[in-house]
Design a protein with these regions (language model features):
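Gly/Pro-rich loop segments of beta-rich domains
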Residues: 129-155, 185-213, 241-265, 297-326, ...
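Conserved beta-propeller blade signature
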Residues: 166-168, 222-224, 276-278, 335-337, ...
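Short loop/turn segments immediately following the C-termini of beta-strands
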Residues: 172, 228, 282, 341, ...
Length: 483
């Protein structure tokens, strides 16, 4: 078992030798672990050697796969639940307590009986799904790694999910990128935490980021990071190396190559299907587009939408105007959706840069309704789910909003309208605190609360999570009358 081990040592290559082998032996344990990894680097080479490296590269990683998945048993093999008639508890038990500080999550399926020929709508609800919980963070500022509430953040901003379901959070005031796996284990994934550090390129844990704020993955799995402390975009490639992509570090408004481009207060960033990166500029009130050279990979920026004036107008490209645009998301047809923060609207931008109103009537407030009759209160981050529906963190109201695209309807999904606060509980009673990050997959919504220094979670699919040191857990199904 190898868990969070950091160490160093020396290797001596004697005269006449050119290779020294380090052996790693995996030790068996009884815990159900995630995949462990040990990464080796070489530093401080001395003597007559002209250079030393690990194999063919400068970094090598050893992966240890776990073989201790627990056996799961159920209290009963099947249960029957009548519509609109009481509740039933489903309990899962594993064959031994989880000794490692992690949890096990078991996804379950709930189906109508085989002889049910008249199924309409949904005949049950999972009571535990209608809850907002704290996924990670103690609420106190700090940079501690750990499980759930053991971890600490300092004014975290944006978030993004990778293809494996890991959540990445821009821990802005810690100048770090944090990774949270499905069990809530928080680790420092990139950054040395030192804004003043003069190394802005290199291995990801040696680079000093400056207020990382928002992130996006390209189709190859490389992460792009908006650094608002330096007004630039950096890239973390799949080998863990950080390079400068765009932005010369000055607050301004200029386009061109990476050393000519200037940004002013970067908001959300997103890739289209052609590999172009769109960058929201909150205080330039516009969206820039980065196009990458297919040979060199160098990025060139251009104006895409927005006049730069703090106004409201629809139109094409620079004929349109925004007031402090904030978040950005993209649909399957490469249409962009931008939260126009101080116009209290969601704007739609086609691939040809035609800007129009998509949702919100422009009046400040929180009101459900059809797309252009609904009201927002300073909308912030937004993201699409796999069904093509758009979700919005309405920052001024401290609520999470769902926009049903097919129905053309806007409705509050979670959060009690009010000032910044922290409260877990039912969807209607939960409270949020300036949500800066919003990410969603098929099973969960993740909300990054900037002022409470926490990551919140809403479960969307039936699952049972057995906490560390426990052997069982339950969920409750309630029958409902759907017609």
């Amino acid at each position: 078992e190898f868990d969070n081990i950091v160490g160093s040592g020396s290797v001596t290559i004697s005269a006449g030798q050119s290779v020294k082998t380090i052996e790693v032996a995996a030790k068996s344990d009884t815990a159900n672990d995630p995949i462990d990894a040990i990464t080796y680097t070489i530093t401080g080479v001395t003597g007559d050697s002209t250079g030393a490296q690990l194999g063919e590269g400068l970094v090598k990683t050893v992966q240890i796969n776990d073989n201790d998945a627990p056996d799961i048993s159920w209290a009963v093999s099947a249960v029957t639940l009548e519509e609109d008639s009481g509740t039933v508890s489903v309990t899962a038990t594993i064959d031994g307590s989880i000794t490692k500080l992690s949890s096990s999550t078991i996804n379950i399926n709930v189906n109508p009986s085989s002889d049910d020929t008249a199924v309409y709508g949904v005949d049950y609800e999972i009571l535990e799904l209608n809850q907002v919980s704290t996924f990670a963070g103690s609420g106190q500022t700090g940079s501690n790694d750990g499980i759930g509430s053991e971890a600490k953040f300092r004014r975290p901003d944006g978030s993004v999910l990778d293809a494996s379901g890991n959540l990445y959070v821009a821990d802005s005031d810690n100048n770090l990128i944090r990774k949270i796996d499905s069990s809530g284990n928080v680790t420092t994934w990139a950054g040395n935490g030192d804004w003043a550090h003069d190394r802005m390129e290199g291995p990801k844990l040696e680079v000093g980021f400056a207020r990382p704020s928002f992130m996006a993955f390209d189709s190859a799995g490389n992460m792009y990071v908006a650094e608002n402390g330096r007004q630039r975009i950096s890239k973390i490639d799949t080998s863990g190396n950080v390079t400068h992509v765009s932005g010369n570090g000055d607050h301004g408004d200029a386009i061109g190559d990476k050393n000519s481009t200037q940004f002013r207060d970067i908001g959300g960033i997103v890739f289209d299907s052609n590999g172009n990166l769109f960058v929201v500029e909150r205080n330039n009130h516009k969206i820039k587009k980065l196009v990458f050279d297919p040979s060199s990979g160098a990025a060139t920026s251009s104006e895409f939408a927005g006049s730069g004036s703090y106004e409201y107008a629809n139109g094409n490209g620079s004929d349109a105007s925004f007031r402090h645009p904030w978040g950005i998301a993209i649909d399957s047809n490469d249409n962009l959706y931008v939260s126009d923060h101080n116009n209290h609207r969601i704007r739609k931008i086609t691939p040809s840069a035609d800007v129009s109103d998509f949702a919100g009537n422009g009046n400040w407030g929180q009101k459900d309704g059809s797309l252009l009759n609904a009201r927002f209160r300073n909308p912030g981050p937004l993201t699409f789910d796999s069904n093509g529906d758009l979700w919005v963190a309405d920052q001024g109201a401290n609520t999470i909003i769902k926009i049903d695209i097919s129905e053309g309807y806007v409705s509050k999904f979670a959060g009690k309208v009010g000032n910044n606060a922290h409260k877990d509980g039912s969807l209607d009673e939960a409270k949020f605190s300036r949500s800066m990050g919003l990410s969603i997959n098929d099973s969960s919504i993740f909300i990054v609360d900037n002022e409470s220094h926490r990551v919140r979670k809403i479960d969307l699919s039936p699952s049972i999570t057995i906490p560390a040191t426990q052997t069982s857990a339950s969920i409750t199904l309630k029958g409902i009358d759907d017609y």
